[in-house]
C-alpha cells in the first residue's frame, strides 16, 4: 500500500481515538466558553425554600445487599430535606439473604415514610423498578443503588433544576472512594470518573447530559416509560429517551453518590464489559439520535461523548499500532519514535496487569492498564451482545473494603 495512504489512515485513526477521549472535551470547553461570552444570564438554579420544595420518591433497588442496607437506610434518614416530603421505596426482588429482613426490622424514626417491596423471583432491576413505579405518588422520583452513599444535600440540589419546565431528568455525580490500601487499583477508575464528571458538567451547561449513571439520577415521574425488559443499561436508555422527547438532562455535581472502587481492575472489567454491551445495545435502539439534522446538539454530544467510545475508537487502537509498524518499517524516523512510544505505553499496561496479580501497587502503571481494559471490554461486550449472552441481571463486581 502507498505510504501516503498509510499515513492518512494512521492519522485518521489517531484523530478518532484522540477526539473520543480528549478532543471532544477540548472542543466542548471551547464551545462552552463562546456560549458564556454570548450569554450573560446565570444558568445556575437557586435553592428552593422548604415550603416550596416538591414531594419526592427515593427509590433504592437492592439485591443481596445485607452488608450495606442498614448503612443505606441511615444515609437516607440523614438527608437535608423535609421528612414529610420524602417517600422511600426499597425494592429487594430476588434477594435471598437478610436484606429484606433487615429493612423490615430497622427502627425507623416517627414520621418516616419507608416501604419495602419484595418478591422472591429475580427478574432484574428493570422489572423491579417498573413494578414499584405504580406506587410512586410524587412528581419527582430519584433512583439510587443500595451500595452507594448519597450526599446529605443531594435531594435539595436535584429538585431545584425542575423549576425549569424543559428539564426532564437530573443526573447526580458518581465519586470513587479511595483509601491508601486501594489507591493504585482505583487510580484509573477514579481519574476516569473525575474526567467524566467534568465532561458531564460541560455537557449539561452547553445543552444536555447524554445519559445518567444509575448510582444517582432522577426524572419527572410523568415522563417515566418502561424500557424493554432485556435492556442492559436502563438508566442510560431511560434518560436519553427523555432527552429524545425534547427535554434536557441536567447534571448536578453537588448531588453525589460515593462508591468504593472495584477490588481490582479485573473486577472492574466485569462492569465494563456489561456497560460496553449495554452501550452497543443502546446505540442500536436509539438509532434516531444519530441523526444530527433532527436532534442537533444532542446528537453531536451523544456521538462525540458516547458512540465513538463504544464503536470506532476501540477499533482504531489496534489499527494505529499495525499502521505504525508498517510505516516504521519503511524507515520513517517520526513513525519509529511514535512506535517506540506506543510500545512503551502497552508495556506499561502489561506491567500494570502483572503487578496487580502480584498485589504490587504502582499507580502510574494502572492508568494505561485501565485504559486498555476499558477498550478491551468493548470487544468482549460486542461478543456478548452479538451472541445474546449478556444477561440483564447485574453481576456485582467485588468492591475494595
Regions found by a protein language model. Name each.
Residues 74-85:
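Short, acidic, metal-binding catalytic loop of nucleotide-sugar glycosyltransferases
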Residues 75, 92-101, 121, 148:
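A conserved acidic beta->alpha catalytic loop
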Residues 1-48:
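N-terminal membrane-anchoring/stem segments of glycan-assembly enzymes
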Residues 68-71, 85, 97-105, 116, ...:
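Acidic helix N-cap motif at the loop->helix transition within catalytic regions
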Amino acid at each position: 500500500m502507498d505510504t501516503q495512504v498509510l499515513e492518512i489512515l494512521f492519522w485518521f485513526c489517531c484523530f478518532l481515538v484522540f477526539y473520543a477521549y480528549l478532543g471532544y472535551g477540548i472542543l466542548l470547553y471551547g464551545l462552552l466558553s463562546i456560549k458564556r461570552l454570548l450569554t450573560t444570564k446565570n444558568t445556575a438554579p437557586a435553592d428552593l425554600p422548604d415550603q416550596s420544595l416538591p414531594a419526592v420518591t427515593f427509590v433504592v433497588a437492592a439485591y443481596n445487599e445485607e452488608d450495606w442496607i442498614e448503612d443505606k437506610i441511615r444515609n437516607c434518614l440523614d438527608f437535608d430535606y423535609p421528612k414529610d416530603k420524602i417517600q422511600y421505596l426499597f425494592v429487594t426482588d430476588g434477594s435471598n439473604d437478610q436484606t429484606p429482613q433487615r429493612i423490615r426490622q430497622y427502627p425507623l424514626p416517627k414520621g418516616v415514610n419507608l416501604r419495602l417491596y419484595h418478591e422472591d423471583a429475580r427478574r432484574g432491576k428493570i422489572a423491579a423498578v417498573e413494578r414499584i413505579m405504580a406506587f410512586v405518588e410524587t412528581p419527582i422520583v430519584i433512583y439510587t443503588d443500595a451500595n452507594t452513599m448519597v450526599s446529605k444535600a443531594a435531594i435539595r440540589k436535584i429538585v431545584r433544576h425542575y423549576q425549569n419546565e424543559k428539564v426532564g431528568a437530573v443526573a447526580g455525580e458518581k465519586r470513587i472512594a479511595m483509601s491508601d490500601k486501594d489507591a493504585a487499583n482505583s487510580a484509573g477508575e477514579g481519574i476516569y470518573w473525575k474526567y467524566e464528571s467534568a465532561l458531564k458538567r460541560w455537557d449539561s451547561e452547553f445543552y444536555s447530559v447524554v445519559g445518567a449513571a444509575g448510582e444517582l439520577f432522577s426524572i419527572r415521574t410523568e415522563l417515566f416509560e418502561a424500557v424493554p425488559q432485556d435492556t442492559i443499561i436502563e438508566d442510560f436508555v431511560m434518560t436519553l429517551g427523555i432527552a429524545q422527547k425534547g427535554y434536557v438532562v441536567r447534571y448536578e455535581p453537588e448531588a453525589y453518590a460515593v462508591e468504593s472502587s472495584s477490588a481490582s481492575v479485573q473486577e472492574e472489567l466485569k462492569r465494563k464489559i456489561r456497560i460496553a454491551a449495554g452501550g452497543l445495545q443502546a446505540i442500536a435502539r436509539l438509532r434516531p439520535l444519530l441523526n444530527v439534522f433532527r436532534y442537533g446538539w444532542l446528537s453531536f454530544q451523544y456521538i462525540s461523548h458516547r458512540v465513538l467510545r463504544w464503536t470506532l475508537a476501540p477499533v482504531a487502537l489496534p489499527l494505529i499500532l499495525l499502521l505504525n509498524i508498517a510505516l516504521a518499517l519503511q524507515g520513517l524516523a517520526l513513525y519509529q519514535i511514535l512506535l517506540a512510544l506506543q510500545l512503551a505505553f502497552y508495556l506499561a499496561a502489561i506491567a500494570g496487569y502483572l503487578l496487580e496479580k502480584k498485589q504490587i501497587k504502582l499507580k502510574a502503571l494502572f492508568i494505561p492498564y485501565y485504559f486498555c481494559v476499558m477498550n478491551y471490554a468493548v470487544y468482549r461486550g460486542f461478543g456478548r451482545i452479538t451472541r445474546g449472552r449478556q444477561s440483564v441481571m447485574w453481576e456485582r463486581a467485588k468492591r475494595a473494603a
